[in-house]
């Protein structure tokens, strides 16, 4: 089909959408509000569905080369006993690829490198759209106006464009948990590639990177907006008595590297991901809690599906209708499952509830864990060409 497209938001989903559009013949501009693209320092796990989407977009091999496969790990108690283990090799046999861990900044750089020079513009804030014409969308930029056949709203959980397109609709809500995370300053020795540890009202996890360092995260049930003068000191007090390597990971972290964000989600699903010639994508469409590690993967699915629909359908309208029909039910189901996983994980605090959960996990056969992962990760992208 081809045409001109404006992608609002230069995160993982927005860049992936731009890659897909560019590969299928569209002239694309990406508008990012941030003035610089210095990454905040987080890491990310990519499941098979996210990697397959990246393969469809042509960047899968580069991402795999920069990632570390996550073969060994599972879920533990604060004392260190195992609640469940995951066989990454078995998962690879089932899906053709393991889960991989990668620094978000590295992934972002690989996506940027796949776009033409000059495609990405930073320091550009989009606060409105001109949708008066039936076959075009105007995007106000500074004192001018960009004219587009298609706009992709990938401006995150707090999307301004979502609020404009669906006035009066439910926006993001606080999910009841806050997350602190960082990447270690130096390589660390880890027995497992990834771990989750569930305590009462708290979770601690890590993923290992190819350079020997690791990202860790700590999720706490807390009121929204609570901050700490010394976040790393607070974490040492809260998690210092938990099993190794948790204290070791904290010791290997610089205080200024710790990031702190409240978790928000779209608890009320959108009735559509499309409004005229505008498509919502990623967190702007289906912001979810991070409990399944599927947020970025779902955004990558969005990007590949949108590009394929626009490549095969005869009109923008039919392509966006196909995109909405294929992506909205699946992504919203994953968001519901992530919310349920959070309730079973760090949100449980009563000792009896925690004990019952732990007993259930210990008794569950390993194939139950495998099925839970396959339910969301076993996805095949549509062909772009």
Where are the regions a protein language model picked out?
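Conserved N-terminal helical subregion
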Residues: 1-5, 22, 47-166, 170-183, ...
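C-terminal helical "tail/cap" subdomain of flavin- and related membrane-associated enzymes
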Residues: 1-3, 65, 80, 248, ...
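Conserved mid-domain beta->alpha element of the FAD-binding
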Residues: 7-35, 152-153, 180, 255-349
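Histidine-centered metal-chelating micro-motifs
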Residues: 159, 179-181, 202-205, 285-286
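Active-site substrate-recognition segment that forms the wall
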Residues: 193-225, 232, 236-241
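Flavin-binding catalytic cores
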Residues: 227-260, 316-317, 324-325
């Amino acid at each position: 089909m081809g045409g001109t497209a404006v992608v609002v938001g230069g995160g993982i989903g927005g860049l992936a959408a731009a890659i897909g559009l560019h590969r299928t013949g569209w002239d694309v501009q990406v508008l990012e509000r941030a003035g610089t693209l210095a990454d905040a320092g987080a890491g990310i796990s990519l499941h098979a569905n996210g990697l397959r989407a990246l393969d469809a977009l042509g960047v899968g091999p580069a991402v795999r080369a920069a990632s570390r496969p996550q073969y060994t790990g599972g879920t533990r108690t604060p004392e260190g006993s195992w609640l469940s283990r995951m066989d990454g090799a078995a998962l690879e046999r089932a899906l053709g690829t393991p889960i991989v861990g990668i620094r978000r900044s590295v992934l972002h750089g690989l996506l940027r490198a796949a776009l033409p020079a000059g495609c990405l513009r930073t320091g550009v804030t989009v606060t409105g759209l001109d949708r008066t014409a039936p076959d075009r969308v105007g995007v106000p930029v500074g004192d001018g106006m960009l004219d587009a056949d298609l706009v992709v709203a990938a401006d995150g959980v707090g999307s301004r464009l979502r609020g404009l397109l669906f006035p009066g609709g439910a926006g993001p809500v606080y999910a009841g948990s806050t997350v602190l995370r960082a990447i270690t300053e130096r390589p660390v020795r880890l027995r497992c590639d990834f771990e989750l540890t569930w305590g009462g009202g708290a979770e601690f996890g890590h993923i290992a990177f190819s350079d020997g360092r690791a990202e860790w995260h700590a999720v706490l049930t807390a009121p929204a907006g609570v901050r700490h003068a010394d976040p790393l000191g607070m974490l040492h007090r809260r998690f210092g008595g938990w099993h190794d390597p948790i204290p070791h990971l904290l010791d290997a972290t610089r205080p200024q590297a710790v990031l702190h964000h409240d978790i928000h989600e779209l608890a009320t699903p959108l009735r559509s991901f499309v409004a005229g010639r505008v498509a919502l994508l990623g967190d702007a469409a289906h912001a979810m809690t991070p409990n399944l590690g599927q947020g970025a993967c779902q955004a990558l699915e969005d990007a590949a599906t949108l590009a394929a629909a626009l490549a095969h359908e005869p009109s923008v309208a039919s392509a966006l209708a196909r995109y909405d029909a294929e992506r909205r039910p699946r992504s919203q189901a994953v968001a519901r499952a992530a919310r349920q996983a959070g309730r079973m994980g760090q949100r449980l605090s009563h000792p009896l509830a925690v004990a019952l959960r732990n007993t259930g996990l210990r008794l569950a056969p390993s194939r139950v864990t495998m099925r839970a992962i396959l339910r969301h990760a076993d996805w095949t992208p549509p062909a772009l060409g």
